[in-house]
């Protein structure tokens, strides 16, 4: 829960525009209640019977994520993966390398 509170702090300070947490369903319901109380937008993606991905942040980012949330993260296109990583604040040069690697693999198997 400490990590979650830190993510809220970073979001409110403008350090992050989007946060992704994978957690059990029970924790997600507690977290969702707290986000609603602070009027922070969020959405939940089913991962398994016991786990969910909880995204929260700026509405523009959540709207973009909604365009591909209907599939598991390991099924994202290289472009969707790059976009999500950038929105989550991951190192952009590493994301670009990951994009190029995934794009090359996809072209090699096509």
Locate predicted features.
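Domain-length accessory/inserted modules outside core catalytic folds
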Residues: 1-110
